[in-house]
């Protein structure tokens, strides 16, 4: 088993977990690429990415170009003479000159079973779409968006209660060992590159705050999935009014689907210790855990103790 000289490119904590796995292996990380430091916190002080922090703790040279399109940055990377480059949630586009620079090209860790979800938010979109299974794909990168040949796939189930947070944590457990398995066997033929069937792909579009607004003209089943998919960000929400006509926005963390009732979508059907039940175009959405402005998430019952007037039975929410 040959030890490889690796360039690692990544930015968030998810990427740092993969870097740590490589550092624990027989392979050598000769350089780390990560996004430039960004202002964070109340003081807006520049903060290093989790990947940069880990690299510096291990005395690994760190490169932080704003782009890899310039010839100078490409020449600098090529001069490292790496065997392979591993890319995990890096955040920069890799031009062909970079993809071709390492002897064995560039590998990417992708948070879904390709080609099902290509793009920025595969974990969230798999829950949003009601998928029952997902996983991690290790692929050889090409110039397309998540279109490269697949080397290794590891599967996991999506539970009916799964949030993006819990699924992210599952994949963060699976992915690093899958990556090491590929690196250990990259040159011995254990993993045969498999072409993707582009006709089976969907684009996992980034989430937006606008999309997180609960739309009662969608089915209760879809809205319940949205609530789980949009947790931890941007968190599903809706608005209601008090008796004086003041609007109040509420975030929703947990809900349950109940059988359909023939009422206009958005109608408040009941509001008690069992939840706040709202009619949708198909099914009833029972809101169980909510958060009002300036408060911590709480049960529907606790919210109703102080805010029952917000949820008059028969009122139709926008």
UniProtKB/Swiss-Prot annotation:
Binding positions for (6S)-5,6,7,8-tetrahydrofolate? 112-115
For this record, the Gene Ontology CC terms, alphabetical, are: cytosol
Q: Quick check: keyword 4Fe-4S in the entry?
A: no
EC number from the UniProt entry: 2.1.2.9
InterPro entries reported for this sequence: Fmt, Formyl_trans_C, Formyl_trans_C_sf, Formyl_transf_N, Formyl_transf_N_sf, Formyl_transferase-like_C_sf, GART_AS, Met-tRNA-FMT_C
Q: Top enzyme class of this protein? A: transferase
Disulfide bridge map: none
Q: What keywords are assigned to this protein?
A: Protein biosynthesis, Transferase
Reaction catalysed by this enzyme: L-methionyl-tRNA(fMet) + (6R)-10-formyltetrahydrofolate = N-formyl-L-methionyl-tRNA(fMet) + (6S)-5,6,7,8-tetrahydrofolate + H(+)
Q: Name one GO biological process term.
A: conversion of methionyl-tRNA to N-formyl-methionyl-tRNA
The organism's place on the tree of life at top rank: Bacteria
> What GO terms are given for molecular function?
methionyl-tRNA formyltransferase activity
- HAMAP family found in the cross-reference section: Formyl_trans
Described purpose of this protein according to its UniProt entry: Attaches a formyl group to the free amino group of methionyl-tRNA(fMet). The formyl group appears to play a dual role in the initiator identity of N-formylmethionyl-tRNA by promoting its recognition by IF2 and preventing the misappropriation of this tRNA by the elongation apparatus.
**Per the similarity annotation, which family is this?**
Belongs to the Fmt family.
What PANTHER family does the database record attribute to this sequence?
METHIONYL-TRNA FORMYLTRANSFERASE, METHIONYL-TRNA FORMYLTRANSFERASE, MITOCHONDRIAL
Q: What protein am I looking at?
A: Methionyl-tRNA formyltransferase
Record organism: Haemophilus influenzae (strain ATCC 51907 / DSM 11121 / KW20 / Rd)
What does UniProt list as this organism's lineage?
Bacteria, Pseudomonadati, Pseudomonadota, Gammaproteobacteria, Pasteurellales
